Amino acid sequence: MVTIISTMETQANNGPGCVGILNGTNGEADDSKTNLIVNYLPQNMTQEEFKSLFGSIGEIESCKLVRDKITGQSLGYGFVNYVDPNDADKAINTLNGLKLQTKTIKVSYARPSSASIRDANLYVSSLPKTMNQKEMEQLFSQYGRIITSRILVDQVTGVSRGVGFIRFDKRIEAEEAIKGLNGQKPLGASEPITVKFANNPSQKTGQALLTHLYQTTARRYTGPLHHQTQRFSPLSILPRFSPITIDSVTNLAGVSLTGPTTAGWCIFVYNLSPEADESVLWQLFGPFGAVTNVKVIRDFTTNKCKGFGFVTMTNYDEAAMAIASLNGYRLGDRVLQVSFKTSKQHKA
């Protein structure tokens, strides 16, 4: 049973990220005022509990808790379509920011997908370490309606890393923000900030990113190179503080991405500690965007982490940014290796 604890503001790193686009709608005004998307739902919440919670506000035409097609596990978000637009508005005002178990849910209108609202996500760097999320929003709000925002923080100290994301309602608003703020010094800043699109890279750009990541990894792990002839094992691809195989470098650096799964883009995370659990992956990847699923691979005997896990994110540019930021990241006494899951890993 889901226990309602309290109401509070939605946090950026609340677990699974925020999904806000409703595909397959016709974009009519009535639809846009009755369709809601609900993010950051507890993974053990059932369809019945989801319907009961939002049905307490008003008559529901339909609702759907989104699940993994293979495992049946909740992906942490769902859609609600009310009969009356007033009930949809009331649901946002009443339930947005509600704390359910360890999650704080976000309730908002599910915007129909259209060209005018795509690619409106900005990447901001060199922010003052003292700037918080609200102050960043105030800086950017003069250029348009902000849908989501977040500032990345150090997982240990909680101190800002000086990097943030701002998603505007429309691309043209994001363009104006770039024109107005890129290269400028906000109040309290010691250097100019960089503001640019965090767009989906092209296939060529994606391969270049992979090449860079694996060349960096290859430089980090020195020693003799050997061809890998045995059946692929995630543990053999990047052994901790040992030689990396030339097969994994050449194949992975030049490989075309396998494409998104039904749930999104799958990321391979290696060199986790035996004590690592799913919450560690949520905390690491949640700040970068919409995380739909995390899985730590455990030893059947000890139930301890075997050193690796997988994270699924819905958006390519957010997944790529997470990889670029977390590959080589020191977690405790370990250095993580983070990459897109490849076709070989799919077969493992």
From Swiss-Prot:
<comment type="function">
    <text>RNA-binding protein that binds to AU-rich element (ARE) sequences of target mRNAs. May also bind poly-A tracts via RRM 3. May be involved in neuronal differentiation and maintenance.</text>
</comment>
<feature type="domain" description="RRM 2">
    <location>
        <begin position="120"/>
        <end position="200"/>
    </location>
</feature>
<keyword id="KW-0221">Differentiation</keyword>
<dbReference type="GO" id="GO:1990904">
    <property type="term" value="C:ribonucleoprotein complex"/>
</dbReference>
<dbReference type="InterPro" id="IPR034915">
    <property type="entry name" value="HuC_RRM3"/>
</dbReference>
<dbReference type="InterPro" id="IPR035979">
    <property type="entry name" value="RBD_domain_sf"/>
</dbReference>
<dbReference type="GO" id="GO:0007399">
    <property type="term" value="P:nervous system development"/>
</dbReference>
<feature type="domain" description="RRM 1">
    <location>
        <begin position="34"/>
        <end position="112"/>
    </location>
</feature>
<dbReference type="InterPro" id="IPR000504">
    <property type="entry name" value="RRM_dom"/>
</dbReference>
<keyword id="KW-0217">Developmental protein</keyword>
<keyword id="KW-0687">Ribonucleoprotein</keyword>
<keyword id="KW-0694">RNA-binding</keyword>
<keyword id="KW-0524">Neurogenesis</keyword>
<dbReference type="InterPro" id="IPR003954">
    <property type="entry name" value="RRM_dom_euk"/>
</dbReference>
<dbReference type="InterPro" id="IPR002343">
    <property type="entry name" value="Hud_Sxl_RNA"/>
</dbReference>
<dbReference type="InterPro" id="IPR006548">
    <property type="entry name" value="ELAD_HU_SF"/>
</dbReference>
<protein>
    <recommendedName>
        <fullName>ELAV-like protein 3</fullName>
    </recommendedName>
</protein>
<keyword id="KW-0677">Repeat</keyword>
<dbReference type="Pfam" id="PF00076">
    <property type="entry name" value="RRM_1"/>
</dbReference>
<comment type="similarity">
    <text>Belongs to the RRM elav family.</text>
</comment>
<dbReference type="GO" id="GO:0030154">
    <property type="term" value="P:cell differentiation"/>
</dbReference>
<feature type="domain" description="RRM 3">
    <location>
        <begin position="265"/>
        <end position="343"/>
    </location>
</feature>
<dbReference type="InterPro" id="IPR012677">
    <property type="entry name" value="Nucleotide-bd_a/b_plait_sf"/>
</dbReference>
<dbReference type="GO" id="GO:0003723">
    <property type="term" value="F:RNA binding"/>
</dbReference>
